[in-house]
Each structure stands twice: as C-alpha cells, then as structure tokens.
Amino acid sequence: FAPGATLSAVVQAESGEFRRVIMTPESYVEQSGRSLEANGFHEVEIHRVSEGYGQILHAFSTYESRNTRQDVEPFARGINSFQLMNDGERWWVVSIYWQAEGSANPIPEKYL
C-alpha cells in the first residue's frame, strides 16, 4: 500500500441511506482480522476492467467471497475499485473502494 492509502466500503444504513466507511489498511486488520481468521475468507476475482494513463491505473474488479476455497456458493459478490500509482519501480495501491451486491443493486452483466 502507498503511504496514506485508504480502504472504503459503501454500506447501507437501516434508514436506507448509503454512506462510505473509510479505513486504513491497519484499521481494517484491527476491525476485521479476528473475524476473518475465525470464519475464513477467500475472495476470487471473476471479471476485471482496467484502464491506465502514465503512472496511474484504475481496475474495476468483480469478486466472489467465500469462507473457504471449497465452498461451492459465495456468501457475497461485489465490485472492488482499485486505484494504483507506479513510482517508476513498482505499483502501489492508493485506494480500494468497494460495494457488495444487493437485491436492489445487482451487478450488471457487463461486469460478470
């Protein structure tokens, strides 16, 4: 991760409003690490669209989440939006922004 990188999730409150939850890589581990270790987590990319210019790259990545590799059905699907920067030596993750699929917002066919 690049210094100052962020992880952001779009979540829907009980009121129906959507909001963005912002984390650092470290706070994500603090918040979710125990649950991920206890329940397992395996995410698979099923589709990707990437665009870049100069030192920046954007990847729109459709995912399926399972507790283990052996699980037949995913417990969640959604889209991750990755923003990356190349410093001339390597690519750095600047941000990851995601939204899980829901009944009111199915993933469009073009991203499957």
Question: Where are the regions that the model predicts?
Answer:
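Short beta-strand segments enriched in hydrophobic/aromatic residues
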Residues: 1, 63-65, 97-100
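Surface-exposed, charged secondary-structure patches
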Residues: 6-7, 11, 19-71
